Structure formats: C-alpha cells, structure tokens
Amino acid sequence: SAATYPVNPSPANPSMTHTLNYGLLNFAASASKKVSNDQINATLSKTVQNKSSSEVANQIATTLNQAVAIAKKYPQVQVSTGNQATYPQYDKNQKIIGWTGTASLNLKSTDTVAASKLIAELQSFMTLDGLDFSVSDAARKATEQELMIEASKNFQRQAQTLLPVWGAKGYQLVSLDFSQGGDYRAPRAYGSVMMLEAASAKVADQNFQAGDSTITVTANGTVQLVK
C-alpha cells in the first residue's frame, strides 16, 4: 500500500522565489524495520447440501448465528462474515436435483490464545480453510511513523552527500512524498497444515510461529541546488 504526504515548504531564502527550472535533483531514500507479526487471521467455512434451496439457506443461517454467538465469548477477537453463495446441482440431463450452500467467517485478533480457543470451538461444526499472521494496523501505523522520520533523515543526508559533486553550497527542498510498502503478512498456513483440532485441549497452548514482516517507508523528493 502507498500513501502520499506532500511537503511544500516556503523558500528558506527569499531570493530563491524564482521559477524552478534548473539545478533540480530528484532522488529517494528509504528506511526499513523488521516487525513481529502480532495479529492472527483465520477463515472458517461451512458447506451444506440439500434438495431444498430454502433448507440450505436455513442451515447456513443457523451455522453463522451459532458461530457469532460463540464468538461473543471472545471479545478480543474481531469476527466478520465472509462470502456466501448458493448454487444448484444438476443431473446428466441438466435437471436441478439439489442445492449447495457455502458461507465463510473471518477472524482476526492480536490475542493468539483467545483466537485459537475460538477457532477450536468453531471447528466442531466448521472447516478451517486458512490461517496466517500479519502486522496489526496499530503496530504498522506506529512503525510507519517512526520510519517516516528515519527516511527523512536519510533523505537529508543523501542531499548533503550530493552537494560537493554538483559544486553546490546548499539546497532547498522543493517537494517530498512518502510511500509505504513491505511484506506485512506471513506465508499462509492452511487447516491441513496447522491441525488445530477442535477436541484438543492443547490448541489454546499451542506455540504459533508468527514470524516477522518487513515494513519500508520511502521518501521521494526534489531539491534545488544552491550555488
């Protein structure tokens, strides 16, 4: 993802209010930091089949209502409904012989223990489709704020380094913007790999390998050389 924060400072020297048409340098400087993944993300789903489309819809609704009711015991976990779909089943003569319905539930939390307990309960009637780890929004934003300062300092140092090469005694900042990037999410681990068994009491105590993500902020700007 990227965000732009334009910086258009007033000229430090009143005599430099002329048109910017020469002595311009455009370059970038970055700052990166490795951050621990502090958020667990999981997706569970339910698939039902029935000859009646209304019965399929009823079973899906019952499943989601049951899941949401259980999730209320874990306020530390944010729960949202995902994709839902109902589609017909056909025989060889293209005649509808039944219906299939699917629905998914998305979970995310910075409380790994609470999330794993909830996942264990939900797995008694839903399937764990996937689980991964990422940097939470709060941690990411805090880190990006730190890196904006560091990237700015790196930009200033780079500008100073370039002055002698161009025979300049100083520079004036013309514009500057920041972009954020990086690998925020650890590789996805699917249910068959994670093996979060619903009946196992060890689920809540499982030591997850959340891993790290690297966050990078780049300062890209233009300066005018002062001779």
Residue ranges of predicted features:
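Short, charge-dense linear interaction motifs
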Residues: S1-K227
